Amino acid sequence: MHNDGCDKKLRHAIKHDTEHEPKFVLFTRPDVNTTQDLFDNDTELNVNLTLNLPTKIIVHGWKSDIRLTPLVDMKNEYLLREECNVIFVDWEKLAAEECYLHAIWHTTYVGQRVAEVIRKLRDTGAEDIHVIGFSLGAHVAGIAGFLLRPYKIPRITGLDPAMPGFIFASNSEKLDSTDAEFVDVYHTNVLMQGKIERSGHVDFYMNGGVTQPGCHERSNCDHTRSAVYFAESINTEVGFWGWPCPNLWEFTIHACPPTTRLRILAGDNVDKSARNYYIVKTNAESPFATRDL
């Protein structure tokens, strides 16, 4: 995390600059690679948006953008599986801040804009709305969910929600289980870039949640794996399977060994009645899903 040159004055100087305004990019079948603006003439929804279809809203994180490979893979996997609307929240110009604290400040504004879009979708007939946020984007999703109350987004998925700057944040500023009807969270780099504490109705700690097999260098590999695993989960025939564990300490001391009797499916097709902690084992390379516990 870089805070060099952080200046609180910039918190207000950039936030409402039209050049830095978040953009909403729509993808639909049949041409899944054609980018479309979600809005025609700034206010009317794109005619290619089909409101009675499932709508997936994907939010990237700090120093990232909608071209991040696992997020693109996610979009492609959804559109391969079914007719749906995939909307990317492109807040690249705000997320590109060298000062991480500035990027955190911007999550509130981006969350407000996402909430406005979801309200527009809901008011015009959309019902099946699923917001997927990676890293800092997970908290953007949570802020949007908080602002939309008493309405609740049907589902929010948090992919390794960012830890730095959020340990003492209030629930209005971060993702938590009250932000949607169902919140599922996937931890892959806790105590480093990702939060260790539970943030959803069900939290999956992939390979224990700290480091990931096959990630040997100090980079974003462990953190990004959350998005990689989730993208694969959309269409995998093998599935990512988790077993319950009361907490990470008990997993560390081998007090909750794998059990097939209580295992559940993790990922996009998760059982929405699932609650609490689960541990998921993966392979070290693609395909990552494994039947082994």
Name each model feature, range by range.
Residues 1-88, 95-106, 116-124, 149-151, ...:
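Flexible, membrane-associating and regulatory peripheral segments of lipid-active enzymes
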Residues 60, 132-144:
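Glycine-rich nucleophile elbow surrounding the catalytic serine of serine-hydrolase chemistry
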Residues 106-107, 140:
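Non-catalytic cap/lid and distal C-terminal segments of serine-dependent acyl enzymes
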Residues 124-135, 156:
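Alpha/beta-hydrolase fold nucleophile elbow
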Residues 155-165, 187-191, 209:
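Active-site nucleophile loop of the alpha/beta-hydrolase fold
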